[in-house]
UniProtKB/Swiss-Prot annotation, chain A:
One of its GO terms (cellular component) is INTAC complex. This is Integrator complex subunit 15. Disulfide bonds: none annotated. The gene is ints15. Pfam families: INTS15.
Amino acid sequence: MSDIRHALLRRDPLSAAKEVLYHLDISLGSALQSSAGPPAGLEKSTVELVEEFIFHVSKDRNIQSKRMSCVQELQLLEIICSYFQEQSKDAIRQVIFSALFSLQGNKADESRMAMLGKLVSMSIAVCRVPILECAAIWLQRTHSAWCVRLAQVLMEDYCTLVPCAISTLQNICSASPRFCCQLITAVTALYDFSTDELTPPPALLEMLVGWITEDPRLLLLTFINSPLNSSLPLGCLEITPLLGLLRWCVKAPLAYHRGRKSAMTNGHGDGEKGTAYEELYSKLHLSVLQVFLMLQVHLTEKNMFCRLTVLPVESVAALIEEVGRLCEKLAPLLDASHIQLALDRLAQALQVAMATGALLCAREDLRALCSRLPHNNLLQLVMSGPVVQPPPHSSPFQPNMYPHIHPGRPSPLSPHSPHQSTLSSPHSPHTVLTAHPTHPALAPHRPLTAHATHPALSPHAFHPASIAFPYRPIR
Amino acid sequence: MSGMFEGNALPGIQTHSHTPNNYSPQELSLEIKAFISGVDQTQGRKLSVRDHARCAIRLLRTVPACREAVLEHLRGVYDEYVASFLQDLEAEGENGGNSASGGASVSISNLEDVIKEVHAVLSEFIKLSPKAWAPLVSSWAVDLLGQLSSKHAGRRAAPHSSSLNELLQLWMSCAATRSLMECYSQCLAAMLAWCPDACVDALLDTSVQHSPHFDWVVAHIGSAFPGTIISRVLACGLKDFYAHGYSSAEKISQQQAIDKSSRVPKIGSVVGILGHLASRHSDSIKKELLRMFQDSLSVPPQNVPQLTSGAGGWENSPHLRRATVPFLLQLAALSPTLLGAVSTELVEFLRPPVLIQLQAQFQALPREELENMLGLAVHLISQSPSGGARVLKFLADTATPSSVIISGPTPSPHDGIREACDRLLQMLLLHLHKLVHNRPDGDEPFPQSSTSPAMPQVIPFLEELQAHIADLCAETLRLERKRHLWLHQLLCLLSVYGGPSIATEALCQLFTQARNPEELALASQLYTQLSTSLSGLLPSTVARCVAQIHTQTLDIKELAQLLNNLATAVQSQEEDGKNGGGTTTTTGSLTQSSMASEVRVAVSSNLQDFCPLLLHGDSGVSKAAVRLLSCSQIPRACSPAHLLRICRAAVSHFFVCLRQQGKSPQAGQEEVGYSRRLLSRLAAYSSLSQKAVLQQLVEGALHKGNQDLFGGLQENPSDDTTQAQNLVPDLGISLLDVNRKFGTSVNFSGNVWSVFHAGIIGKGLKPPYTPLHPDPDRVSQNMQTLLAVMVQCCSSSGGNPTGSAGSTCSEPNVSDKLPPINAEAAKVIAVTLVENICPDVANGELSWPPEEHSKTTVERDIHIRRCFEKNPVLFYLLHVVAAGRPALCYCSVILRALLSTLLAHWESSREPSVSDSPWHLQTSCWLVSCMGEGQLLPPVLSNINEVFPHLSPFEVRLLLLGVWEYMRGNSPMPQKFTFCADQGLFFRDFSRDGDVARYIAPIHSVLHKNIDRLGHLCWRFQV
């Protein structure tokens, strides 16, 4: 290694970087072939070579490191892209990507992150799938803080810097779904609605809605491909973007006051923009609920229903607490309708998540968590739960109940989908109706009878059949 | 339903299809390879500069990760364009070939398109996403501008960096640099909202690195964003000033070399930038500097969240606030422009609360730093081009003790401030003293430039104070504790620095504004200190005073004050002269005497300029003027014109004084004294002036406006009309007016009957006119004063001035006590009287015709008599003439007129006694006595006036007829008089005239007839 270092010191920065890449390819490739099992950790000397000649972190105080110009750096990025494109073995690609960009906890990490951001950004533009796949794995294994930083770089490049560049980013969904799934998770961690800068850009929101609407399974990709018993490292991103997206949908109405002020200032145009945003969030919410239903099918197939945690209770509790704090803080500023909308979405999500087994939480615990939230009718229904049956009947009721519901669940959604779309367009508050099909299965209440009294709505005519079916064993 | 959903999605797809980002990933990959290698990937040929740039632009639009590389590449494109641009200019300058010029033009045109495209793309990006692009593009543009400015500074087409306007014109005519400038301006405008510091910091760093070639950029940006650039430049400069070791002395001592090398460029850049902006935005700079000063002393705002942009960050930093004042002082030291901008209004902010805060801030400073700061402040005050007067006033006001009462054992903050200002003022005076006398000291904290002693240094502080001499003198004359000492010292320095003109102005102001002898002493002190180094001060000062009088810039009070002060200055010499004979004078007295003599000479040189003030409308001014002139001597070389003008003014003033004396006896008497003294001096100067003074005195006494002063009667309208008719030939009255007045009546002017206007037919006699009689005492006093003046003037002879004339009042009838009157002077009075009283010159010879012949001149005789009736002063004047023998000879026509009218009166009188005609009796006695005094009659004949009261009218007529016969037989001729040297008078020997016995025969007859009542007077008439 000393010989290699001395030789590299005499060369120009770009040539030295190329040699380091070549060296990695030779040494790591050989190591993989020689060993039958998983490769051992990288040698320290290799890491030092990478840091000194690719990320230009000086190892010797007396020698000032040579820096590449921006054009040379672009050349290096292009070389890396070409290498990963030409390398046919996925294992080697993963090892080399890890050698280059695994964070070491030293001062070279800043340079690492800068170059990683440029590499991924460039790969998105030129659609380098191998790099995107490696980046997806990197996002899965790295601490969320660094993931957020990468997401920030990409969002700045494609949502802020270059107009209409979002279309380039949109196209990679078909090329690298795994990267997109991880990117959504990172993006939801980045934008938390705390400030105007940390509110999802409209272009991004539109793109995500398009992705998820086109292929809802995108959100479950990482979850499905992960080993079943693997535990997430501490501090990493969540296994699915579902919780992040749910947070967006619930918080969006509470952040509306800023947009409303802007609308007042700028006139009618921004008002229309606000309406468009509401529609997008409504679509996003619907997609999330649909994904929960798909998740149930998947869990059932794997025989992991009610056993595997998809939405951690702690995370949900944190979200509920945050929503409570926001509602309390913003009550003087917002109309009650916005708060009710946020709570409706929260109630719907909780109901569907618990019904589909994504959220494992007892109703008593849920009532405790939601005790400080403002009053909301739907939330009250969700928290009250089904009527308590006599003990002798509880055990036979439950197994019988669930198997009966599952086969019939998808079919009612199909005819309701266009109806919901139609209703959602003009009046966003009407998204409450999207939750109605779930009520018969879990909450047999008199209000359902009241709904039957509206004969004018043809979709409601379908309800008696559904209502009659699940209640038959009880009666 | 699904169809409807698809319909909703369709517009989005269509929208995307229209966007320019329709490159496939493969195409973008090829673009990147082409950009990196410079070779077209499909055709394999090398890209031209233009195509390569266009490739870069496409990547800029599509691949965000390439933006830094693209901007780096575009640097070369801009550089190439600038090189071609300058080469083209140089080719045109050298009248190069057409082909070369054409080639360059083509090249520039190609790259210009590219540059315009780059500019359009960047401008669009900045507009759409300012927060993302503005920091990146602004730093890129500024750095590139700096590089281009420095790299091409040596080209022939590039003007020198000192000519900023030419440099700006060149670079703004180049499309590349203009594009960069516009990009930077756009970025700066966008970044003003959240973080202007970063933008301005980059500008400052580039300015430090590439100055002076980069100054045109700063000038242009500063003109576009003056407020922001000024405030941010100052804020950045302050941070840099603090960061470079201001905080502690130890740090300074340790890193002296490093600090000096790294500190100066930054603050120098700040000074340069603000200097460029000062030509058009001095007001903004002034406001920012003063606001900076105020904010550094005010309490930082509480509970204000810390701004991440740092726009107001320095206000919240205690260290930066403490460093603000030294920073501003340093700025002022390096930039006279900034010093001038601030010093004008800075004193307005120095209120007691602000001073207390300043003191609190500076208490924490080490003594050495405080001394350095004070020295720097003193240096800045002396170098401030404007506002120095206000600074001086502020320092003097603050440093002056307000009360002698000790406030207590613990000094109050005000005392500390006062002491600081006192010390500052002392240091300033010492500093100015060194500067003025051009004696640089080794301890001087700011050594002066190495100018030769022959060329005095320019001191802006003193330059400005030269325009405030009047104010400085006014403040000095207030004689406040310590204050007048400081200001007096400053006046000395200012006079030495400014030269004779300033010294003259200062002395002139002191003479003008001093209100009492104590204040006037300051002028003496100033003259004492200046006379050693400046010569000819007082003549210039008096000339300056005269100029001031001519321009009428002084009000009445000031004018009188000036004249009085000059008079006081002159009088001090006379007093010393009187006392100097017997006693030893002190040094101060000698100096004052020296100044007094010079002032006296100077005033004499400008006498003709002061004399119009004798007739000033304000009594205070005229009194002061007469006082000054009475103390001065008339110059030897005075021209006749000036002399006559002075005489006329002095005589006019004399009559004004007499009138004033009637109103306020005390003050008027003093003024009359001055006036008499002045007239005496004038009469003693030369025969010409004596003649002029006497003539004007006579004319003035007879003037209508002054008749009432001497008991004259107000004229009767009827008499006025008659007189007007009689005086037609002399006064030039219009004949048309006369004809209109009398209608068809014919004017028989000259006819003997027109004189006797006794009344109107049918209405009886004309009612008697009762004139207003003035105060007898006042008339008597004025008469005495007039006679005294005339006697004084007649007693002096030309070329023989007397030291001081006596002011004793003498009785006109007591001829023995009168001082000898010059015969020539008396002649002047006689001639003047004849000219003013006698309406025509016919029959004006000295010889007397027979008494019957007087019928031909009866009208004139009556006119003359009326003059005597209206002007009693004439009797006294004739008496003076009689005393100056033989001058009375020239008044023969007047004497004949009076005698003729008296003879006619007594002949026609039907009264039993002469006492029934008191005026005629008195006039007869006076006339004979006067003729006797003038030695026109022998004593035996002149004594007959003693018997007139005891005779009858007919008898008086007989005696007067005898007088006429004697005068006819012995005509009054000056040749008959002989000068007696021992007495200084002329005498007439009557023995040579022959026997007078036949002329006294009627006297004896009358005596014999009245022997019972006149026997005791017979001895008076013995031959």
